[in-house]
Amino acid sequence: CETRLYRLLHYHSLVKKVSPTPILVVYALVNRSYVLDLQPNKSWIRHLLAQGFDIYLLDWKSPTRMDKYVSFDDYVNSYIDDCVEIVQNNNSADKITLHGYCMGSSMSAMYTSLHQEKIKNLVTIAPVIDTSKDSTVIANISRQMDIDKLVSTIGNLPPEKLYECYSILKPFKQGVNKYFNLIENIDNESFVQNFLRIEK
């Protein structure tokens, strides 16, 4: 299934005995979901498939100017809900497992609280549930910004600008240090391959 703002990928179990409860993985809006399946020996998706789960991965596309007014309500109650229903229908399942990562965890928690009748299990990794307790550098900076003015001026923040914001969290590690590590490990083919996969 593919729409303008997302595509739903389906991975079939690697074993004969398949769990009756399929998993829908909801990834973050600002990163790419392929990080969960970079290579066979470092794949969260492959690990779940080997445990007998049928996996669906919600891969968000970058919003464009025409998506300026798309809201969290649209993401949670339209797009995620559409995917949940596809997973339910494909697997003849009344309830599914919703597995979120980062912002996907927050959206999955919202969805589960609103649609408990469709969710058997909620699994979250790195969720932000209570933003009032977030004391990271980026949270403190964002509290000083006029978000409404930012959105009305430029619309959606381009992905490269979001990356710049996230690099503020660990500027040396995100900026220079990763390249020093590459130089130090340039003769290690496995390290170089992993670096290239993540940095592409």
Regions found by a protein language model. Give the residues of each.
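Short, surface-exposed "cap/lid" segments of acyl-processing enzymes
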Residues: 1-64
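A structural signal for isolated positions on well-ordered beta-strands in alpha/beta enzyme cores
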Residues: 56, 97, 121-123
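Short secondary-structure capping/turn micro-motifs that flank functional sites
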Residues: 64-65, 128
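Conserved catalytic-core motifs of eukaryotic protein kinase domains, centered on the activation segment
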Residues: 67-69, 135
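Alpha/beta-hydrolase active-site loop
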Residues: 69-90
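Alpha/beta-hydrolase-fold enzymes
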Residues: 89, 93, 107-200
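Gly/Ala-rich beta-loop-alpha elbow adjacent to hydrolase catalytic centers
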Residues: 99-104, 108
